[in-house]
């Protein structure tokens, strides 16, 4: 109930207007009761941030069935776009809002959920390079470029900026996927380059 109420207030009024008292009022608890479960609102939003990553992980569960690493990378990008467009509030907490990262700094711990997603991307990019599917390069740099590309698309879309390029709302996600296709096509190795048959 506490997390549901927090997300409702966050969506309707923004992070700055969410307080423990307002959360308590919404669910008819006393603020003291809320504090029994969460130290502060940053901790509440950190928990929501974790739930968002769990949702994204569920979307990516079938990636292991895709043997071709380039197709897997492409599907990973599509899933990212679809997740961000379907869950803008969670996306905000996971990749845009400062508060969850502030909580990580306060706790002195690693960004476990984010690191897991990033490592999966790096592993897939490295496999693509090793098997000749994409141009050889620094896998860290290529992974950062791929992530930055899809993150930029989602951020522009959920903040209402992408309409400058795509006025029709129903075309936003299809155009984002076309942009992803362009990226993948441009990092793909040319047919002339040798490719490990085992990767086909």
Where on the chain are the PLM-derived regions?
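Hydrophobic/aromatic-rich alpha-helical bundle segments in the mid-to-C-terminal region
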Residues: 107, 130-179, 191-200
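Alpha-helical DNA-contacting segments of helix-turn-helix folds
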Residues: 44-52, 94, 102
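Helix-turn-helix
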Residues: 1, 9-43, 47
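Short secondary-structure transition hinges
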Residues: 86-123, 141, 169-170
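Hydrophobic/aromatic residues within well-ordered alpha-helical segments
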Residues: 41, 48, 52, 56, ...
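Short hydrophobic clusters on alpha-helical segments that form packing/core surfaces
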Residues: 2-10, 18, 52, 56, ...
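Hydrophobic alpha-helical connector segments
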Residues: 61-89, 142-146, 189, 193-200
